[in-house]
Amino acid sequence: MEWDSAGRGFNGTKLRWSQLEQILSGSAPSADDAASVHSPAREAPEMDKDPQPRPHLSLVRDTDMPAAPPETTTIPFAELHAYSNYHFLNGASEAEDMVRQAQRLGLSGLALVERDGFYGAMRFAEAAAEEKISTIFGAELSTDNGVLTVLCRGPEGYRRLSRVITAAHMQQGNHNRQPRYPDFTELARAADNHWYVLLNAALANNAEDIVTAFGANNVIAECHVGFIPEDADNVRIVTDMAATWGLITIVSCTPNAATRADAHLAAAKHALSDRRDLNNAEADCPPLGGTWLRNGAQIRAALPPLPHSDDMIANTVHIASECAFTLNLIAPELPTTDVPAGHNEMSWLEHTVWERAEARYATRTPELWEQVRAQITYELDVIKQLNFPGYFLIVCGIVDFCKGNNILCQGRGSAANSAVCFALGITNVEPISAGLLFERFLSPERDGPPDIDIDIESGRREEAIQYVYNRYGRDYAAQVANVNTYRRRGAIRDAARALGYPQGSIDAWARRAADPPEQVIRLAEQFRGHPRHLSIHSGGMVICDRPIADVVPVQWSAMENRSVVQWDKDDCASAGLVKFDLLGLGMLEALHHMVDLVQEHHGKTINLWELDLTDSNIYAMLSRADAVGVFQVESRAQLATLPRLKPRTFFDLVVEVALIRPGPIQGGSVHPYIKRRNGVDPVTFDHPCLKPALEKTLGIPLFQEQLMQIAKDAAGFSAAEADNLRRAMGSKRSPARMAALKKRFYDGLFQTNGIEGQVADVLWNKMTAFAAYGFPESHSQSFAALVFFSAWFKFYYPAEFCVGLL
């Protein structure tokens, strides 16, 4: 590092070595140091004489970095311009990590902004609620005149910004995915005094236009402290603009990482975003690859000597307080369904159910009809109590469209347990004779609306999707996103690209044809699990009573005529957006052909819902493993299991569908269940409290619903807590969230049933292991119906069965 004769560092400020170390390491300065230091120094880059590609600072692992001691701050501060890893190819830390570190540093508020979207907003909101830290929402807009950072001044500001982002994405059509924003004047009109615009040094040439358009009261001068020599010049430019236009001034270090250890990944992402490698991009990166969250004392120490430095920090805290709000203030509802005069949604649902029930049960016994009447009355009472008639009418409308256009479909999921769903024609399994429990689908204790997935013959699913868009309007319906994250192959590829390796080597490592170098492996491990880009969910759609853009921005998908929200299914559920899954299924297309062929050649109309699920001929055929071509049970493992399981009832098929899957096979559940099923081994439970949940599967956990039931019975979880546990134990597990739930589970075990010690450990370990592979019983029920239907055609109409498959 260069030093002048007066012992001064960068920016001409006196700087002791201890102060330099404190600034670069991120540790809090002493009171004396904080009073005397006003600017940072930049560590000289390491010289590496190894041939390219050379190891980069990004390869430092979290475990290589010394653990920082708990930090406190005596200077209040809030960070208003930070990035999580949902700022694709920029942020190096998850939103949860950013929030936890902000809380640890004592920050009063945090803003995580993303480029042209709110991709991680819901995860940010949930994490901040857990840590009890104020949330500020905003975004960076890629305008023609530069990147404009906007902060929302409350829920109305959020809605307006989301609409603007949506309009910028959607007006470009299906093929140009770069959003296009209007000029500053139009943006200001859209904001209508509900945004703050951050004016930084990069926008100096547009300062007059921005202030003129938005008004000085809505523009804030943002001093960026990047801990680099250029800070002094940037701060001077911003403070001059503030003086010229009479603007409030705030300060930010625009962190793209939670801690110093995380910041090293940011350089690799920055290089990839610029289509360069680290060696060529390093000059444009901050020291150590990126900036990370700092507390008020550290920010104050890094500011150049200015008369109003303390005011800038105080302004930052004030703006954070003014802009803070929680996303639950924008909770949406389902759209209202148009019903005939004299009816409301509930009365029309009741009318429709009873009218259709008579036709659906016309061929059933009078004794069953009496049970059906009582069951439907009960279910309608529950639906009315929970105020869900609109949900059922929407699903019914989609199913009616399919049937009216000769598209075979059926409801999947726990809807198979509902007599109302069967009466409406949503499902094809009669639940009472099959012994299915309605409470598994809907109960007064349920948190949130029911979940009905609709399987549609795959060749015509697009018609159903476009029906939803046309019926409710493009502004009120959209598909759910799927966040593609780095897995091994993608992580290896991007890590090697960032490190400058040739494409041939990268391809070989990605294909596992050769082992990558250690430095590639280490960097790839940092990439794994991070968001890479958005894609489209297989069939999930959300429908809203207001423009969806009021809740979350919408953009075009790569697929023709598909628009997609910027959140995945979990984020949509957290925000209160109700998802409807329209899923393509090839077997339904085959069954449709079989039904048509029987009608054509035999003159018989086959209604799938009228088939007798107790037909012993079908179960005998399956028990002989005569199941080639039958849905879900024709694999080698299924054919080997069928003669051992000897299915005799419909529930046996439900178990067969769930049992022969990679998870239960690897988890060792198959043989114990079959032995218990055949009376070889006794049925046992780890604790008596598990019997209600596991009795029907002979003490062997098979279904996801059983996990939730165990949490309620054994640990006293509420229905909402149990569902939260199920989601937390899914594929995207958060260690911190799991730790909190583990404590709640152990506490609940002891308080509810006096369980502790080894038994508690066994239950928790089984829960966590089972959650990774447990198949939903609701889906098993629907798949089992397709097993039976396809087997029925195989037994009674083998020629039509074979042609239908072809």
Give residue spans per PLM region.
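Conserved active-site carboxylates
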Residues: 1-84, 98-109, 136, 140-225, ...
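Anion (oxyanion) recognition and catalysis
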Residues: 103, 129, 191, 215, ...
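Active-site-adjacent beta->alpha loops and helix N-cap segments on the catalytic face
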Residues: 91-95, 117-127, 230-237
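Histidine-centered catalytic micro-motifs
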Residues: 77-86, 253-256, 538, 776-780
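Short secondary-structure boundary/capping segments
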Residues: 125-128, 237-238, 264-269, 425-427, ...
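Short acidic/histidine-rich active-site segments
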Residues: 248-261, 411-414, 537
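Acidic, metal-coordinating catalytic cores used for nucleic-acid/nucleotide bond scission
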Residues: 115-120, 227-231, 256-259, 483-487, ...
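Noncatalytic, beta-rich nucleic-acid-contacting surfaces in large DNA/RNA-processing enzymes
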Residues: 13, 75, 108-112, 128-132, ...
